[in-house]
Amino acid sequence: MWYRTFRTLGYTICRPYATCATKAERFVKTIDPSTLPRGYLVSSTYAGIKNAIRPVTSTNEPSAATTNVPHPQEAPKPDVALIVSSVPAAIAGTFTTNVFKAAPVVHATTALKAAGPNARVRAILTNSGCANAVTGQQGLEDTQTLVNRVQALLSPRNQNAIPTYEQDARSSSTDVLMMSTGVIGVRLPVAHIQRCLEHLAAPSILQSHPDAWLEAARAYMTTDTFPKIRTRQFILGNRRCSIVGIDKGAGMIHPRMTRSGGQLHATLLGVFATDAPISSATLQRCLDEAVRVSFNCISVDGDMSTNDTILALANGQAPFVDLDCTDTPNEWTETEHPDMVNKFAEELKSLCIEMSHLIVRDGEGAEKFVQVHVRNAGTYEQAHAIASSISTSALVKCAMHGEDANWGRILCSAGYASLPASTPAWTLDPSKVNVTFLPPPHQPDDLAPLPTLVNGVPQAVNETQAKKLLSYEDIYVDVDLQGGSWGSQGRSEATYWTCDFSKEYITVRW
């Protein structure tokens, strides 16, 4: 068994941010077609969803994708996308824990639960502009209507026998799942979307080339300023495997997702499609861990969406490296192929972390990317809670925007963090806390770490050094709890990523 990664994670250090290229110019990367997973086709189109729902939305509320309104000479941004696997693919998902779950979230979680650990899907339909959230039973029926239509189009022999909502609700079919993002409290314009589906599902329209994937990523966008898509390719055993990831998000970002078990808008959506031969149950466990340390560790504004969804598909179509040796198992499982699964899980986790960073960098009005690393806590959950509290503090975020090394705000937000219980009980010890600002990795200047608090005691701060450190777009904050009440037994750590609050955030959200 051997293993090699073909792509490495790059760093973008840019200072001062005012002199940088646009986010789209910096973060939209050319996709190498050879790194796209085998056995997937995508399509996208403009259905006019925003225009269709505009009469029932507030004129003062920016519709989803306000920042992406096309110039009169430009083609409108696509707002519906379809991803299709050539064979039924293993499926895994994590979903918002918001009580007001949107209709597509309810549909997906119900379908996956009914299908059990061997769930399979053929396609993912996604729309932007309307969240289909807080729309009651009618919202569920609208989702099912569109899912049924896509399923029928992908199975031409069944086009004359499309099941009714009641019939499909009794089945455990997960052939098609749907994701939605946009304005809350407004019904999907089903007719507008439905009339595009035959076009989207046409063999002549479904494509696998990079431009098609990029357009699909654009269809996911709401207040995003650039499409977010990355690929990874690696060899596992005798298979050359690939993963493509698409996600979106810029506002209403503070996910806390788990597996299935007013005029606000925006959300976090993501799809990761791989050709690796991974079973559904194993894929779910890999996705759970990847999301735990990536998407569940970011925040833009502290607001959890009704629609947050990450889906992962695995269709097993990865090509063999050695064509004379094709006896690789159909699907890898943790019990029978632990090395393969562990290496795949690391690739998925690394890609999820990279994709989650793109959401933070594209946060509404964001001018700073802030990493908060909390270490030497009692448990991971406690370190995560403290890092989250710091990252969501409006005062901390404003200080980062003002390039102010305000350790007091960091300390304050750490002190009121809501800590999960542990046995024995663990508490933060104020006399042990260290707060240090670190220079960004690969920065061109010879900068040293800047301690602002040591053992709970404020330090004299070199303001010139502080200003230089915080003038970077990327700011790194290290909070060492030195074990707290557990002393040397407190060794857990967590990393969170957030952005600053700028005047532009208020403008976008007004």
From Swiss-Prot:
The keyword DNA-binding belongs to this UniProt entry's keyword annotation: no
Matching SUPFAM superfamilies: DmpA/ArgJ-like
Keywords for this protein: Acyltransferase, Amino-acid biosynthesis, Arginine biosynthesis, Autocatalytic cleavage, Mitochondrion, Multifunctional enzyme, Transferase
Record-marked site positions (Involved in the stabilization of negative charge on the oxyanion by the formation of the oxyanion hole): 181-182
Cellular compartments per GO CC: mitochondrial matrix
Enzyme Commission no: 2.3.1.35, 2.3.1.1
InterPro entries linked: Arg_biosynth_ArgJ, ArgJ-like_dom_sf, ArgJ_beta_C
Listed Gene3D superfamilies: arginine biosynthesis bifunctional protein suprefamily, ArgJ beta chain, C-terminal domain, L-amino peptidase D-ALA esterase/amidase
Residues given in the record as substrate binding sites: 222, 248, 267, 364
Location of region: Disordered: 57-76
Pathway it works in: Amino-acid biosynthesis; L-arginine biosynthesis; L-ornithine and N-acetyl-L-glutamate from L-glutamate and N(2)-acetyl-L-ornithine (cyclic): step 1/1; Amino-acid biosynthesis; L-arginine biosynthesis; N(2)-acetyl-L-ornithine from L-glutamate: step 1/4
UniProt GO molecular function: glutamate N-acetyltransferase activity; L-glutamate N-acetyltransferase activity
Stored PANTHER family: ARGININE BIOSYNTHESIS BIFUNCTIONAL PROTEIN ARGJ (PTHR23100), ARGININE BIOSYNTHESIS BIFUNCTIONAL PROTEIN ARGJ, MITOCHONDRIAL (PTHR23100:SF0)
Further information: This protein may be expected to contain an N-terminal transit peptide but none has been predicted.
Function statement: Catalyzes two activities which are involved in the cyclic version of arginine biosynthesis: the synthesis of acetylglutamate from glutamate and acetyl-CoA, and of ornithine by transacetylation between acetylornithine and glutamate.
Assembly with partners or alone: Heterodimer of an alpha and a beta chain.
Protein name per its UniProtKB record: Arginine biosynthesis bifunctional protein ArgJ, mitochondrial
Species lineage: Eukaryota, Fungi, Dikarya, Basidiomycota, Ustilaginomycotina
